[in-house]
Amino acid sequence: MQPIRTMRPAETGFAAAARRLLRVKLPPAALLAAAAATVAIAVAAAGWRSTTALTPSAAQLDEWQAMVAQAAEPHALARLRDLARAGSGAAQAALGIALVAAREPGLRDEGRGWLETAAQAQGADNAPAARRAQLALGKALLLGSGDMPKDYARARALLGAAAEHGDAAAAYYLGLIYRSGYGTAADPVQAAHWFEIASQAEIPAADFMLANAYRDGSGVPRDEARALALYRRAAEHELPEAVQTLAMAYRNGELGLRPDADAFHAQWIETAHALKHPVVGP
Protein backbone atom coordinates (compact mmCIF):
# COMPACT_ATOMS: atom_id res chain seq x y z
CA MET A 1 0.00 0.00 0.00
CA GLN A 2 1.33 3.39 -0.96
CA PRO A 3 1.80 5.76 2.03
CA ILE A 4 -0.59 8.67 2.14
CA ARG A 5 1.27 11.84 1.27
CA THR A 6 0.18 14.90 3.23
CA MET A 7 0.71 18.35 1.79
CA ARG A 8 3.16 20.48 3.67
CA PRO A 9 1.85 23.84 4.96
CA ALA A 10 3.96 25.65 2.40
CA GLU A 11 2.11 23.84 -0.36
CA THR A 12 -1.33 25.14 0.56
CA GLY A 13 -3.18 27.99 -1.13
CA PHE A 14 -1.66 30.00 -3.97
CA ALA A 15 1.88 28.65 -3.41
CA ALA A 16 0.65 25.07 -3.73
CA ALA A 17 -1.19 25.89 -6.94
CA ALA A 18 1.96 27.43 -8.39
CA ARG A 19 4.06 24.37 -7.51
CA ARG A 20 1.52 22.04 -9.07
CA LEU A 21 1.63 24.05 -12.28
CA LEU A 22 5.41 23.73 -12.42
CA ARG A 23 5.21 19.95 -12.03
CA VAL A 24 2.64 19.56 -14.83
CA LYS A 25 4.11 18.99 -18.30
CA LEU A 26 2.31 21.62 -20.39
CA PRO A 27 3.31 23.56 -23.49
CA PRO A 28 4.72 27.02 -22.58
CA ALA A 29 1.64 28.89 -23.85
CA ALA A 30 -0.77 26.71 -21.89
CA LEU A 31 1.43 26.98 -18.81
CA LEU A 32 1.39 30.78 -18.99
CA ALA A 33 -2.40 30.84 -19.42
CA ALA A 34 -2.93 28.56 -16.44
CA ALA A 35 -0.59 30.65 -14.31
CA ALA A 36 -2.41 33.85 -15.25
CA ALA A 37 -5.75 32.29 -14.31
CA THR A 38 -4.37 31.18 -10.95
CA VAL A 39 -3.04 34.67 -10.21
CA ALA A 40 -6.38 36.25 -11.19
CA ILE A 41 -8.28 33.96 -8.84
CA ALA A 42 -5.89 34.75 -5.99
CA VAL A 43 -6.16 38.51 -6.54
CA ALA A 44 -9.96 38.36 -6.71
CA ALA A 45 -10.15 36.36 -3.50
CA ALA A 46 -7.82 38.77 -1.72
CA GLY A 47 -9.90 41.72 -2.90
CA TRP A 48 -13.11 40.10 -1.68
CA ARG A 49 -11.58 39.44 1.73
CA SER A 50 -10.31 43.03 1.93
CA THR A 51 -13.70 44.51 1.00
CA THR A 52 -15.51 42.28 3.46
CA ALA A 53 -13.14 43.19 6.27
CA LEU A 54 -13.59 46.91 5.58
CA THR A 55 -17.40 46.80 5.55
CA PRO A 56 -18.57 47.78 9.05
CA SER A 57 -21.53 46.19 10.74
CA ALA A 58 -24.69 48.10 11.59
CA ALA A 59 -23.63 48.01 15.25
CA GLN A 60 -20.27 49.57 14.35
CA LEU A 61 -21.98 52.33 12.37
CA ASP A 62 -24.29 53.03 15.31
CA GLU A 63 -21.28 53.25 17.63
CA TRP A 64 -19.47 55.69 15.35
CA GLN A 65 -22.67 57.72 14.96
CA ALA A 66 -23.00 58.04 18.73
CA MET A 67 -19.33 58.99 19.11
CA VAL A 68 -19.64 61.73 16.49
CA ALA A 69 -22.95 63.03 17.86
CA GLN A 70 -21.66 63.24 21.42
CA ALA A 71 -18.14 64.54 20.92
CA ALA A 72 -17.29 64.71 17.20
CA GLU A 73 -14.73 61.96 17.88
CA PRO A 74 -12.11 62.34 15.09
CA HIS A 75 -11.55 58.67 14.22
CA ALA A 76 -15.26 57.87 14.06
CA LEU A 77 -15.92 61.04 12.03
CA ALA A 78 -13.16 60.14 9.57
CA ARG A 79 -14.39 56.58 9.11
CA LEU A 80 -17.99 57.67 8.51
CA ARG A 81 -16.87 60.34 6.06
CA ASP A 82 -14.75 57.84 4.11
CA LEU A 83 -17.63 55.39 3.88
CA ALA A 84 -20.18 58.09 3.04
CA ARG A 85 -17.98 59.46 0.24
CA ALA A 86 -17.57 55.92 -1.08
CA GLY A 87 -21.35 55.72 -1.49
CA SER A 88 -22.50 53.83 1.60
CA GLY A 89 -26.11 54.87 2.20
CA ALA A 90 -25.99 53.54 5.76
CA ALA A 91 -22.90 55.63 6.52
CA GLN A 92 -24.43 58.71 4.88
CA ALA A 93 -27.52 58.40 7.06
CA ALA A 94 -25.47 57.77 10.21
CA LEU A 95 -23.18 60.73 9.53
CA GLY A 96 -26.10 63.01 8.71
CA ILE A 97 -27.98 62.09 11.88
CA ALA A 98 -24.84 62.60 13.96
CA LEU A 99 -24.04 66.03 12.52
CA VAL A 100 -27.42 67.66 11.82
CA ALA A 101 -27.68 68.93 15.41
CA ALA A 102 -23.96 69.68 15.87
CA ARG A 103 -22.84 72.91 17.52
CA GLU A 104 -20.74 74.08 14.58
CA PRO A 105 -22.75 75.50 11.65
CA GLY A 106 -20.40 73.91 9.15
CA LEU A 107 -20.97 70.46 10.60
CA ARG A 108 -24.73 71.02 10.69
CA ASP A 109 -24.69 71.93 7.00
CA GLU A 110 -22.62 68.84 6.25
CA GLY A 111 -25.08 66.73 8.21
CA ARG A 112 -28.06 68.05 6.29
CA GLY A 113 -26.23 67.42 3.03
CA TRP A 114 -25.60 63.78 3.89
CA LEU A 115 -29.21 63.33 4.98
CA GLU A 116 -30.43 64.78 1.69
CA THR A 117 -28.14 62.40 -0.19
CA ALA A 118 -29.16 59.33 1.81
CA ALA A 119 -32.87 60.21 1.65
CA GLN A 120 -32.75 60.11 -2.15
CA ALA A 121 -30.82 56.83 -2.37
CA GLN A 122 -32.34 54.24 -4.68
CA GLY A 123 -32.31 50.45 -4.57
CA ALA A 124 -33.32 47.78 -2.09
CA ASP A 125 -29.92 47.78 -0.38
CA ASN A 126 -30.22 51.48 0.44
CA ALA A 127 -33.91 51.42 1.43
CA PRO A 128 -33.36 51.16 5.22
CA ALA A 129 -30.83 54.01 5.15
CA ALA A 130 -33.17 56.12 3.02
CA ARG A 131 -35.99 55.64 5.55
CA ARG A 132 -33.69 56.65 8.44
CA ALA A 133 -32.56 59.75 6.59
CA GLN A 134 -36.10 60.72 5.60
CA LEU A 135 -37.24 60.43 9.21
CA ALA A 136 -34.30 62.39 10.61
CA LEU A 137 -34.46 65.18 8.03
CA GLY A 138 -38.26 65.34 8.09
CA LYS A 139 -38.28 65.57 11.88
CA ALA A 140 -35.63 68.32 11.84
CA LEU A 141 -37.60 70.34 9.28
CA LEU A 142 -40.84 69.88 11.24
CA LEU A 143 -39.55 70.69 14.72
CA GLY A 144 -36.60 72.90 13.84
CA SER A 145 -32.97 72.04 14.49
CA GLY A 146 -30.24 74.58 15.16
CA ASP A 147 -30.35 77.25 12.48
CA MET A 148 -32.24 75.03 10.03
CA PRO A 149 -35.50 76.82 9.17
CA LYS A 150 -38.72 74.87 9.45
CA ASP A 151 -40.14 73.64 6.17
CA TYR A 152 -43.48 71.92 6.75
CA ALA A 153 -44.08 71.01 3.11
CA ARG A 154 -40.69 69.33 2.77
CA ALA A 155 -41.11 67.67 6.17
CA ARG A 156 -44.48 66.24 5.14
CA ALA A 157 -43.03 64.85 1.91
CA LEU A 158 -40.08 63.20 3.66
CA LEU A 159 -42.07 61.81 6.56
CA GLY A 160 -44.79 60.64 4.20
CA ALA A 161 -42.26 58.71 2.11
CA ALA A 162 -40.84 57.01 5.20
CA ALA A 163 -44.26 56.30 6.70
CA GLU A 164 -45.54 54.78 3.47
CA HIS A 165 -42.68 52.28 3.69
CA GLY A 166 -43.52 51.27 7.25
CA ASP A 167 -41.55 53.65 9.48
CA ALA A 168 -43.69 53.95 12.62
CA ALA A 169 -41.90 57.01 14.00
CA ALA A 170 -42.43 58.84 10.71
CA ALA A 171 -46.11 57.88 10.89
CA TYR A 172 -46.34 59.51 14.33
CA TYR A 173 -44.87 62.80 13.13
CA LEU A 174 -47.05 62.70 10.03
CA GLY A 175 -50.02 62.35 12.38
CA LEU A 176 -48.90 65.50 14.21
CA ILE A 177 -48.74 67.39 10.92
CA TYR A 178 -52.31 66.46 9.97
CA ARG A 179 -53.66 66.95 13.48
CA SER A 180 -52.38 70.51 13.82
CA GLY A 181 -52.38 71.49 10.15
CA TYR A 182 -48.67 72.24 9.83
CA GLY A 183 -48.27 73.54 6.29
CA THR A 184 -51.50 71.90 5.18
CA ALA A 185 -55.17 71.79 6.12
CA ALA A 186 -55.85 69.97 9.37
CA ASP A 187 -57.24 66.50 8.68
CA PRO A 188 -58.39 64.58 11.79
CA VAL A 189 -59.06 61.41 9.79
CA GLN A 190 -55.54 61.34 8.34
CA ALA A 191 -54.10 62.20 11.75
CA ALA A 192 -55.91 59.31 13.42
CA HIS A 193 -54.88 56.97 10.61
CA TRP A 194 -51.18 57.68 11.07
CA PHE A 195 -51.41 57.68 14.87
CA GLU A 196 -53.01 54.22 14.61
CA ILE A 197 -50.09 52.92 12.55
CA ALA A 198 -47.57 54.36 15.01
CA SER A 199 -49.58 53.04 17.96
CA GLN A 200 -49.40 49.52 16.53
CA ALA A 201 -45.63 49.80 17.00
CA GLU A 202 -46.30 50.69 20.67
CA ILE A 203 -44.94 54.23 20.50
CA PRO A 204 -46.24 55.77 23.77
CA ALA A 205 -46.72 59.24 22.31
CA ALA A 206 -48.78 57.75 19.48
CA ASP A 207 -50.90 55.83 22.00
CA PHE A 208 -51.60 59.11 23.79
CA MET A 209 -52.51 61.03 20.65
CA LEU A 210 -54.75 58.23 19.40
CA ALA A 211 -56.40 58.05 22.83
CA ASN A 212 -57.18 61.76 22.57
CA ALA A 213 -58.75 61.15 19.16
CA TYR A 214 -60.99 58.37 20.50
CA ARG A 215 -61.90 60.42 23.56
CA ASP A 216 -62.94 63.41 21.49
CA GLY A 217 -64.27 61.55 18.45
CA SER A 218 -61.72 63.35 16.29
CA GLY A 219 -61.26 61.49 13.02
CA VAL A 220 -62.58 58.27 14.57
CA PRO A 221 -65.85 57.32 16.31
CA ARG A 222 -65.91 58.38 19.96
CA ASP A 223 -64.87 55.42 22.14
CA GLU A 224 -63.95 56.10 25.78
CA ALA A 225 -63.12 52.46 26.50
CA ARG A 226 -60.59 52.42 23.66
CA ALA A 227 -59.22 55.76 24.81
CA LEU A 228 -58.80 54.48 28.37
CA ALA A 229 -56.95 51.37 27.19
CA LEU A 230 -54.55 53.50 25.15
CA TYR A 231 -53.97 55.97 27.98
CA ARG A 232 -53.17 53.08 30.29
CA ARG A 233 -50.71 51.55 27.84
CA ALA A 234 -48.95 54.88 27.40
CA ALA A 235 -48.91 55.34 31.18
CA GLU A 236 -47.26 51.95 31.59
CA HIS A 237 -44.37 53.42 29.60
CA GLU A 238 -44.36 56.39 32.01
CA LEU A 239 -45.48 58.97 29.48
CA PRO A 240 -46.22 61.96 31.78
CA GLU A 241 -49.19 63.22 29.78
CA ALA A 242 -50.88 59.83 29.93
CA VAL A 243 -50.26 59.36 33.65
CA GLN A 244 -51.63 62.84 34.36
CA THR A 245 -54.70 62.21 32.19
CA LEU A 246 -55.46 59.04 34.14
CA ALA A 247 -55.05 60.91 37.43
CA MET A 248 -57.57 63.53 36.37
CA ALA A 249 -59.95 60.84 35.10
CA TYR A 250 -59.92 59.19 38.53
CA ARG A 251 -60.43 62.53 40.25
CA ASN A 252 -63.31 63.67 38.03
CA GLY A 253 -64.88 60.33 37.20
CA GLU A 254 -64.10 60.48 33.47
CA LEU A 255 -63.48 57.87 30.76
CA GLY A 256 -66.04 55.58 32.34
CA LEU A 257 -64.20 55.54 35.68
CA ARG A 258 -65.77 56.26 39.04
CA PRO A 259 -64.22 59.03 41.16
CA ASP A 260 -61.47 57.42 43.24
CA ALA A 261 -59.36 59.62 45.54
CA ASP A 262 -56.84 56.88 46.29
CA ALA A 263 -56.30 56.07 42.63
CA PHE A 264 -56.04 59.79 41.87
CA HIS A 265 -53.26 60.29 44.44
CA ALA A 266 -51.43 57.18 43.25
CA GLN A 267 -51.52 58.42 39.66
CA TRP A 268 -50.45 61.89 40.73
CA ILE A 269 -47.37 60.44 42.41
CA GLU A 270 -46.68 58.49 39.23
CA THR A 271 -46.96 61.73 37.27
CA ALA A 272 -44.20 63.30 39.34
CA HIS A 273 -42.04 60.22 38.82
CA ALA A 274 -42.67 60.19 35.08
CA LEU A 275 -41.71 63.85 34.77
CA LYS A 276 -38.33 63.04 36.32
CA HIS A 277 -37.78 60.25 33.79
CA PRO A 278 -39.26 61.50 30.53
CA VAL A 279 -39.85 59.08 27.69
CA VAL A 280 -37.51 59.62 24.74
CA GLY A 281 -39.50 60.73 21.72
CA PRO A 282 -39.64 58.60 18.57
Residues of each region from the PLM?
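Terminal, low-structured helical/coil segments at or just beyond the last alpha-helical repeat
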Residues: 245, 251-282
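N-terminal leader/linker segments that initiate helical-solenoid repeat arrays
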Residues: 39-97
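Short helix-capping/linker turns of helical repeat alpha-solenoids
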Residues: 72, 86-89, 101-103, 121-124, ...
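N-terminal intrinsically disordered, acidic low-complexity segments at the extreme N-terminus
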Residues: 1-15
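Structural signature of tandem alpha-helical TPR/SEL1-like repeats
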Residues: 71-75, 105-114, 148-158, 185-194, ...
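N-terminal Sec-pathway targeting helices
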Residues: 20-34
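Canonical positions in the second alpha-helix
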Residues: 81-83, 118, 123, 161-162, ...
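Hydrophobic face of amphipathic alpha-helices that form TPR/SEL1-like repeat modules
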Residues: 94-101, 134-143, 173-180, 207-216, ...
